[in-house]
Amino acid sequence: MLSKSITKLVQYAMETGLVPECEKNYTINLLLDVFHEDEYVEPEESFSDVDLEETLNELLDEAVKRGLIEDSVVYRDLFDTRLMNCLMPRPAQVQKEFWDKYQNSPQEATDYFYKLSQDSNYIRRYRVKKDQKWKVDSPYGEIDITINLSKPEKDPKAIAAAKNAKASSYPKCLLCPENEGYAGRVNHPARQNHRIIPITINDTPWGFQYSPYVYYNEHCIVFNSKHTPMKIERNTFIKLFDFVKLFPHYFLGSNADLPIVGGSILSHDHFQGGHYTFAMAKAPIEKHVTIPGFEDVEAGIVKWPLSVLRIRHKDSARLVDLATHVLEVWRGYTDEAAFVFAETDGEPHNTITPIARKAGDMFELDLTLRNNITTEENPLGVYHPHAEYHHIKKENIGLIEVMGLAVLPARLKEELELLEEYILEGKDIASNEKIEKHAAWAAEFLPKYKDINKENVHEILQKEVGIVFTHVLEDAGVYKCTPEGREAFMRFIESL
């Protein structure tokens, strides 16, 4: 049985181009060694179009049977990554192949690297497929909703083991270059099948990789080779454009550098990008503005729920200068009438979420104004999802959400399924503790629909989730899309 599964895995590796034909025996022997097995019997049957998930599961079941691993998702993931390592080209080979293809075209290089990152099972296609995705019309264009199901839930045993595991500071975090080839442990994922492309931006060494959870097409992460904290500054804008010049078909953005309005990792300087056009990028300019000293730069307020100033020019250096000016003014800007405070008790509140892209021969930079002030009414943040929407989304509004893609928690899958059932059967939503948090929301939207049935209930809920997410984005906007809000936005622009 083991020989057969190993044969299938090696066949998969040859079909996908991970392993050349001449390395077949070598790869079989590496896999035998992982299983502490001396014997191999070539199966009589031949295999093609091998299903990776199924083959890995056969090998994992065998490893459990042999007492090599515990039967839980955390240990299985650590072990199957070790198996995939036997099929992987070395980092130097991947880098050479990437830059060889790059000479032909940047897109050919990224196509190769993205396919490799999936074939290697670093991006687990069969898990990503489970994510629920849909689009919803909004006053700001078509926004994307996803319920992220590709991160496996840890089982209680593994959680307990992680608690008792001795603390390690190697690698310092999930974004450090030392992850490449790391075997992992119960509280840190295995990364032997992970490859990084070294790049230079702003004359400093950075790494380019894909996100294992691909929230959107070719979702990449670009990270500083040093473990250094996030900081939005002049150099940030230079780095964003250096990357976009290297890969003009990709956008690149940065999370803000303050808690609440930032991303989940503030400790390691990094950006996120990819090959995808978000609703925000499609959103038009609703009001053109001219900024003194930068009359040659196209600028305007974007029709978007968050407060975005878009600037465009053929010369990225002009955009870097203007963005730096906007950032410096915004960091120190207070407008009490609009409830914008640069700082309270010495704590700074204003920052920016920037996104860079190339459109034709123009460089474009979207500067999203952020503020992380908290009050007694809104202890998690004034410009953050308000409590009435926490049943759908209470996490930070980071870069990906800012651009118009909701990344919603896995719990919603089951909750929305239950909600459908309760709505169709006319049951009391508040009576079920799993979904009682949705009762007020349902009571609000149900009267809008005359006839809710089995055919349309799913679509109705998807649409209503989209409406809630749109409100969440409006909450995160410092200047609201109202005449008063736009007036206050213009006061800031005039201060430039």
Task: For every predicted segment, state its role.
Residues 206-211, 236, 240, 244, ...:
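Structured alpha-helical segments in the cores of large, soluble enzyme domains
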Residues 193-195, 225-252:
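Helical scaffold of the NTase/Pol beta-like nucleotidyltransferase catalytic core
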Residues 239-243, 325, 468:
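Amphipathic alpha-helical segments that form well-ordered structural scaffolds
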Residues 259-267, 345-351:
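Beta-rich nucleic-acid/ligand-interaction surfaces
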Residues 1-222, 226-229, 303-305, 319-323, ...:
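Active-site microenvironments that recognize anionic phosphate/pyrophosphate groups
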Residues 217-224, 262-278, 366:
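Histidine-centered divalent-metal-coordination microenvironment in nucleic-acid enzymes
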Residues 244, 248-264, 273-334:
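Catalytic or ion-translocation cores adjacent to nucleophile or general acid/base/metal-coordination motifs
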Residues 208, 252, 269-271:
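Hydrophobic faces of well-ordered beta-strands that scaffold small-molecule active sites
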